[in-house]
C-alpha cells in the first residue's frame, strides 16, 4: 500500500512539474514549416516589439489575444509555435496556453525567441 501511495504521489508531482511545458522547435524546423504554410506562430513580445520586427506570419498575441480563436486555423492538429524574447523568457507560455485552451494539440515553443531567430539569420516581417 505504501509503495502504491508513493508511486501515486510521484506521478502527480511529475505531472504538476511538466504541466504547461511545451516541446522546443528548432529554427530550421520552424523556418521550413513557415515556408510550407503548415504552422501558426504566436508572438507574445507586445505591439512595440511586433512592429519593429516579428517572425513572418506571426500573430501579435498582446494585441489580438481575444481574437486568437478567429486567427488560428480551424484544424486543431495544426502546429502552433509560441515565442517571446529569447532563452530564459517564459512569456511564450501565455500564448501557448491560450492555444491549448482553444483545443490545439500540437503546440511547440521556439526557445531561442525573436533574438535567436534574428541571430540565426531569420527573416523579419514588419507591420
Predicted regions and their residues:
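Rhodanese-like catalytic fold shared by cysteine-dependent sulfurtransferases
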Residues: 2-6, 15-28, 36-39, 48-82, ...
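Structural scaffold elements adjacent to functional motifs in cytosolic proteins
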Residues: 41-43
